[in-house]
């Protein structure tokens, strides 16, 4: 059995890691770390986990017996705590943005904090699970993608790689539930502020914008910029990303649907919807699925892609476990076969 540790154990990302890893046949949760809740029973923070008798612990590097440690922490914590563990030879899967952006200047411009050391950035593997191979011996630090980038990149990757789009025309209109903001209190997620309300935020300066652009640029082999506008909606969890992109070749809905279906034929967690149907966030709730609906406006030759995920599963903890499976050469669906919770 692989001994796993979870850092940031009192946050939403950690809750999902605990829930999902309980059913993983090759994993045991050896340690749950939280610097603010050391020695407290897990069930005191999460009453729905009454059946788990573990206590929060303080993270240590010396004598740490984990094979893999998941970090579900803010980026500054990851930047400080992860390098010594990697140096010790422990596999680390980081759910923060600390190691996603390879250009330190761009990171500092968007995150408003000092970037990780360049050596650490160079060694971190940014892993969208659907097309990343990981070497158990060579890969020590996996940078798990963000939630908005996951939903967006899964939809755009086939079109960019097939070179059928006008790269200057990409518009991403994305909606997210409030769990994406974490458990920390802020005025904009108070019930009276959020309920029956819809708001755009971080226009032009969201941390996920350079992450999306960085990866699209790698696929395209040239610099790619996007217009990305996120919105906060009054629901607990879920992301719906509507993407508009001009096609440089003539396509119909049918021909683009065929391309997308073929591209993801062997990827169990990407479900391309039938023509004329478009996914909703509830239809992937609690699951590791990404559902994508496709339409081509033939008059303007514009592709409209609707991509939905659960931000806490496919957008965070589920993809992290998927990366664990790839790292250890397990079946990719191991521990992740849960159907969506509906209604």
UniProtKB/Swiss-Prot annotation:
SMART domains: Semialdhyde_dh (SM00859). It catalyses: N-acetyl-L-glutamate 5-semialdehyde + phosphate + NADP(+) = N-acetyl-L-glutamyl 5-phosphate + NADPH + H(+). Its main location: cytoplasm. It comes from the Bacteria. Pfam families: Semialdhyde_dh, Semialdhyde_dhC_1. Pathway: Amino-acid biosynthesis; L-arginine biosynthesis; N(2)-acetyl-L-ornithine from L-glutamate: step 3/4. The active site is at 147. One of its GO terms (molecular function) is NAD binding. It is found in: Cytoplasm. One of its GO terms (cellular component) is cytoplasm. Its EC number is 1.2.1.38. The keyword ATP-binding does not apply. Keywords: Amino-acid biosynthesis, Arginine biosynthesis, Cytoplasm, NADP, Oxidoreductase. GO terms for biological process: L-arginine biosynthetic process. The keyword Oxidoreductase applies. InterPro entries: AGPR_AS, AGPR_type-1, NAD(P)-bd_dom_sf, NAGSA_dehydrogenase, Semialdehyde_DH_NAD-bd. Belongs to the NAGSA dehydrogenase family. Type 1 subfamily. Catalyzes the NADPH-dependent reduction of N-acetyl-5-glutamyl phosphate to yield N-acetyl-L-glutamate 5-semialdehyde. This is N-acetyl-gamma-glutamyl-phosphate reductase. It comes from Staphylococcus aureus (strain MRSA252).
